[in-house]
């Protein structure tokens, strides 16, 4: 975005080769709108899988707990299930075409008045603006007040071949037993250069239990998954080594102010939380768009940074609060919250105007900071 405005942009990448890291995810209508602005939606859609609803049921009785349909939006638009490599490839290529300079094998650990310092102690020239997009454990954000709080629960995830029927290729599907067990399957399209369709499989797990899970071997765990959701048997057959499953560790923090002198913080570096509402990548894209728009509108840097912080404040705070509030209904010990979820919230969610409100919530549209959006 900034390079297309005619600015010289340098990206410092901590690894020797820039590459995607992480599970498949959902691009929500807010994130897709940013890609629309960049003219990149079509390239992502060619690799992605349209998702028109999110469905969750309780395992014992099959009670529907979650049923969110994007058709309930005033302006319906499906989400996309995306393999992380697909979005990376499209954005990386666009950056190179726009003239962005990428310096690899440079981990930046500090920023002061437009100058960056790397892990080896080397300093960069002074930049007009530093944008910290280095993730939830950013050392730059930590120096400006970010206090990352690890959450007790995370998830095991793996990329698998798409299993086909009876799984719905247009839905994120989840099955729960209480709030302590959850298994999900998300269709994520394909990787660049590989036509085979894929899924992201995930299993809720306390991070403290990860070592015990590995030590026990896959078969006892597979038996648990099959007992919860028998249809996953074929999918589980593709998992033969614990190393195929990666533990995602979740944490929560919200930076009090995402700006400082010649510094803007975006994405998980500014605000991270559980992915229960599926907003992480989309929030980062929104941050980038709002920041670029503020810089284009106002040549005065402090004023532009203040506008960025102001326009993102309430949207970020709302979704951070919603995520923190909803997560214990899906990832927690105890029986009270899942009982409320199964017997009360599930029924209330079917009463108007709840279906539209839920669709707007998971789409990221509540308090959307973009002035051109009308729901």
Language model regions located:
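Active-site metal-binding loops of divalent metal-dependent hydrolases
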Residues: 15, 263, 269
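FAD-binding beta-loop-beta segment adjacent to the flavin cofactor pocket
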Residues: 249-265, 317-318
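Glycine-rich FAD pyrophosphate-binding loop
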Residues: 3-23
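Active-site-adjacent segment of FAD-dependent monooxygenases/related oxidoreductases
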Residues: 23, 27-94
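C-terminal helical "tail/cap" subdomain of flavin- and related membrane-associated enzymes
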Residues: 46, 293-375
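Glycine-rich phosphate/pyrophosphate-binding beta-alpha loops
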Residues: 249-255, 270-282, 314, 331
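Conserved FAD-binding catalytic core of PHBH/FMO-like flavoproteins
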Residues: 93, 98-100, 106-245, 254
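Generic enzyme active-site microenvironment
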Residues: 11-12, 130-133, 266, 273
């Amino acid at each position: 975005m900034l390079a297309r405005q005619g600015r010289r942009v340098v990206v410092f990448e901590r690894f020797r080769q820039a590459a995607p890291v992480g599970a498949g995810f959902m691009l929500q209508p807010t994130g897709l709108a940013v890609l629309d602005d960049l003219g990149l939606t079509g390239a992502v859609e060619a690799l992605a899988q349209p998702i028109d609803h999110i469905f969750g049921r309780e395992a014992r009785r099959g009670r529907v707990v979650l049923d969110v349909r994007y058709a309930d939006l005033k302006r319906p638009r499906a989400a996309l299930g995306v393999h992380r490599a697909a979005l990376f490839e499209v954005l990386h290529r666009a950056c190179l075409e726009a003239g962005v300079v990428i310096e690899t094998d440079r981990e930046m650990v500090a920023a002061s008045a437009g100058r960056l310092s790397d892990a080896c102690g080397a300093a960069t020239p002074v930049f007009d603006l530093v944008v910290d997009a280095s993730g939830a454990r950013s050392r730059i954000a930590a120096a400006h007040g970010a206090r990352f709080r690890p959450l007790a629960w995370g998830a095991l995830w793996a990329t698998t071949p798409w299993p086909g029927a009876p799984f719905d290729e247009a839905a994120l599907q989840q099955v729960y037993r209480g709030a302590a067990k959850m298994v999900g399957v998300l269709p994520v399209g394909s990787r660049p250069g590989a036509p085979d369709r894929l899924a992201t499989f995930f299993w809720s797990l306390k991070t403290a239990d990860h070592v015990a899970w590995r030590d026990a071997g896959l078969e006892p765990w597979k038996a648990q998954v099959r007992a919860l959701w028998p249809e996953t048997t074929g999918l589980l057959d593709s998992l033969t080594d614990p190393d195929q499953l990666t533990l995602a560790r979740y944490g929560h923090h919200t930076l009090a102010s995402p700006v400082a002198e010649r510094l803007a913080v975006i994405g998980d570096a500014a605000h991270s939380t559980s992915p229960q509402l599926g907003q992480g990548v989309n929030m980062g894209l929104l941050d980038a768009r709002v920041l670029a728009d503020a810089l284009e509108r106002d040549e005065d840097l402090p004023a532009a940074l203040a506008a960025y912080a102001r326009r993102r404040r309430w949207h970020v705070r709302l979704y951070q609060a919603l995520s923190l509030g909803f997560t214990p209904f899906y990832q927690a010990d105890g029986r009270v919250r899942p009982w409320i979820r199964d017997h009360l919230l599930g029924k209330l969610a079917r009463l108007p105007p709840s279906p539209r409100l839920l669709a707007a919530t998971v789409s990221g549209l509540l308090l959307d900071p973009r002035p051109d959006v009308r729901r």
